[in-house]
Amino acid sequence: MSKYSDAKELASLTLGKKTEYANQYDPSLLQPVPRSLNRNDLHLSATLPFQGCDIWTLYELSWLNQKGLPQVAIGEVSIPATSANLIESKSFKLYLNSYNQTRFASWDEVQTRLVHDLSACAGETVTVNVKSLNEYTAEPIVTMQGECIDDQDIEIANYEFDDALLQGAAQGEEVSEVLHSHLLKSNCLITNQPDWGSVEIAYHGAKMNREALLRYLVSFREHNEFHEQCVERIFTDIMRYCQPQSLTVYARYTRRGGLDINPFRSSHQSAPNHNQRMARQ
């Protein structure tokens, strides 16, 4: 378990508890989780070593128009990594469900409400794009960039998180390259439910040992943290052990409850070049 899994800030979350599903608009359903919980554990100061954002895709977004006709859309939300809070995913789902039987004058009104409520919960302005299904149908399914490190003939017997697996992992020639793995799996901090993801790592620095990196990523398999926290841990561990001159970590997780979360952290870039689905999304 994470060192902060029993933090008082988590005690009031609806996650892991039986809840009622509201169908009338209610922004009070949103629940924040302070980013400081895991950042204190990572010994991060107010001056963060990364930029970035958390990109959410909202697949179950529906409301009624003024005539009572249901509307459906797909939403894309970007929450800055500098925000005080991340948004707990079950509360996000419950909040979106509260739109289901509520009448709104226009799609713009829905988008404006989303921006206002999510920004208030995160503690910083978020961006929201509400798309029609026709718009989203044109979006391609893509793969991650660079070299996949998954097809290695190695034996693994331990699945407990171990950052020291990166010790000495970067001792090769200086390179600029992109690596990725589809074997990232961790567990929800509260419910222990599995979270499945793919992760792309772009860096400039001493060449990283593929076996060491894969063993490290697999060691998250029984680790309990939220998606955003895992990605920040990967970023800080690679910076600490491998000391690249530049680093970007971009994970795309499979959806749960009609939402997927795609955290992006970079030493030099505030947002990814794309927000396109992977095969498992």
Curated annotation (Swiss-Prot):
Top-rank taxon, per record: Bacteria
Organism: Vibrio cholerae serotype O1 (strain ATCC 39315 / El Tor Inaba N16961)
Gene Ontology biological process: queuosine biosynthetic process; tRNA modification
Residues annotated for substrate binding in this entry: I87, E88, S89, H227, E228
One Gene Ontology MF term: preQ1 synthase activity
Official protein name in the record: NADPH-dependent 7-cyano-7-deazaguanine reductase
Subcellular location: Cytoplasm
Record field: compositional bias (Polar residues): 264-281
Gene that produces this protein: queF
Annotated positions binding NADPH: S89, K90, R256, G257
Keyword annotations from UniProtKB, A to Z: Cytoplasm, NADP, Oxidoreductase, Queuosine biosynthesis
Cited function: Catalyzes the NADPH-dependent reduction of 7-cyano-7-deazaguanine (preQ0) to 7-aminomethyl-7-deazaguanine (preQ1).
Region of interest (Disordered), ranges: 262-281
Pathway the protein acts in: tRNA modification; tRNA-queuosine biosynthesis
Active site: C188, D195
Enzyme Commission number(s) of this protein: 1.7.1.13
Subunit annotation: Homodimer.
Main location: cytoplasm
Family per similarity comment: Belongs to the GTP cyclohydrolase I family. QueF type 2 subfamily.
GO cellular component term of the entry, any: cytosol
Catalytic activity: 7-aminomethyl-7-carbaguanine + 2 NADP(+) = 7-cyano-7-deazaguanine + 2 NADPH + 3 H(+)
